[in-house]
Design a protein with these regions (language model features):
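Beta-propeller blade repeat segments, especially FG-GAP/WD-type strand-to-loop junctions
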Residues: 105-119, 153
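Acidic/hydrophobic-patterned starts of short beta strands in beta-sheet-rich repeat architectures
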Residues: 88-99, 134-137
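Beta-propeller blade termini
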Residues: 79-88, 126-134
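Acidic, small-residue rich beta-repeat scaffolds with periodic aromatic anchors
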Residues: 28-51, 138-244
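N-terminal secretory signal peptides that target proteins for export/translocation
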Residues: 1-7
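A glycine-rich, hydrophobic loop/mini-helix early in the fold
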Residues: 69-84, 94-96
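Sec-dependent N-terminal signal peptides of Gram-positive bacterial secreted proteins and lipoproteins
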Residues: 7-28
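Blade-edge motifs of beta-propeller repeat domains
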Residues: 29-77, 115-126
Length: 244
């Protein structure tokens, strides 16, 4: 009797492990499917050579990609647009990064089972990957306005601003000023004015750009020839820093 009881307990335990395993596989498949829907749309848009407007409402994710391929042939565009699945915040679930050259055009994560767009990047508002779950945002709104921000992706898939510089023309002194905050907004009332020349600001831009990491991209031309791979694992330390 005792042996039967032990056998039943072991059988129940094995069944639980099996069901948990199936649940995990289903979750992974679901994440792949959600990301694949986005990649399918991008692939179709680039392959067809049609404007992003033909794919419904005006969407930043499509516009960001279209900006970089509109002057290319469909074949060139499919080679130029890249993607990678990478766990950026150490939660064990990959984010979807899309880009061209080493510039990110889109970052997606999954929130509550739905695709969540973290950001879209354009030529004049560009994003780059710094490694360890961190990102660089560099943009310009003309000769008198530039931004330079550093961010990391938290465990909930939100961007957290670590440092944000921006330039501002002060008509009172007829001079460009540099401001800094950790809010990620170009608001001088929320910022600290820095004793920094434009030349120093330019050198800071160059210094941070030199820290940009090269990603293990796969081209859209290769998309569909195999399942997308999760590349790279990140872990979060007790201090909340993401490490590889």
């Amino acid at each position: 009797m005792k042996g039967k009881k032990g056998w039943k307990q072991r059988a129940c335990l094995c069944l639980m492990v099996f069901l948990i395993g199936l649940s995990g596989l289903a979750g992974a498949s679901s994440r792949d499917d959600i990301y694949r829907e986005e990649l399918d749309i991008l692939y179709t848009m680039v392959q067809s050579g049609n404007s992003y407007i033909l794919f419904g409402e005006e969407r930043d994710d499509l516009l960001a990609v279209w900006e970089g391929v509109r002057d290319l042939s469909p074949e060139q565009g499919l080679e130029a647009v890249k993607y990678q699945l990478l766990d950026c915040n150490g939660d064990g679930k990959p984010e979807l990064l899309i880009g061209q050259d080493n510039r990110l055009t889109n970052l997606f994560t999954i929130r509550d089972g739905q695709l969540h767009q973290v950001f879209s990047g354009f030529y004049r508002n560009a994003w780059y990957y710094l490694g360890n779950g961190r990102f660089l945002n560099q943009g310009s709104g003309g000769a008198s306005f530039s931004i330079l921000g550093e961010y990391h992706l938290d465990g909930n898939g939100n961007l957290v601003c670590e440092s944000y510089y921006f330039t501002h023309w002060d008509p009172a002194v007829e001079k460009m000023e540099v401001y800094w905050n950790t809010f990620g907004v170009p608001d001088i009332t929320l910022s600290e004015k820095k004793d920094m020349t434009m030349d120093q600001f330019g050198k800071l831009q160059e210094k941070l750009r030199n820290k940009v990491k090269k990603l293990s991209w796969k081209s859209l031309a290769r998309y569909g020839k195999g399942r997308v791979d999760v590349e790279g694992k990140a872990r979060v330390t007790a201090a909340g820093k993401v490490k590889r």
